[in-house]
Amino acid sequence: MQTQERPPSTEQIREFVIAGHGNIEKVRQMLAEDPRLLNASYQWNENDTETAIQAAAQVGSANVAQFLLKQDAPLEICTAAMLGMRDEVEHRLDEDPRNANATGAHGIPLLPHTVWSENPGLIQLVFERGAKSGATLALHNAVSRGNHEIVKWLLDNAGPDVRSKNFQGKTPLTVALERSNDRIVALLKQHGAIE
């Protein structure tokens, strides 16, 4: 009589997806123990699922995303944008202009994913091709990376809400102050930011 291996449990999938947000060692270990986790999707709520590579893409964890891609995880446009894969992103936008409205995990739009690439030309490309939603989250991402050039571009072009709070309840100005990034602090204040 053959015994069938049990599929990964919901808790294992959840743990793997959480690790995908940046814990490369845990991702490697868990995937070595059970390769079926690679494309397993955790359901956070009725309309919100996430895989480990989507987790990596939404937080800008390039090393985790690259590792998972080498294991044959699917490459979505949001992941390609986060990794700065301009040719791939441009190809997908040419193939179907509606890809500018693509979202990753938790419905996060393409623009905030692209900001993680820290590639101003790619950010401008996706924006000009229609990826205009998510400007406020994109600003939070750029501030958290301390990228003055991208913060300035977003403020000048994308119309983000400089007074919005991130998932930790912090405004972009608060984050810039905590990181002692005086150039970004001055820039945000010029655009009406408050703590």
Name every feature range the model reports, one short phrase each:
Residues 22-23, 60, 84, 118, ...:
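Ankyrin-repeat intra-repeat helix-capping/turn positions
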Residues 66-86:
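A generic tandem-repeat structural signature
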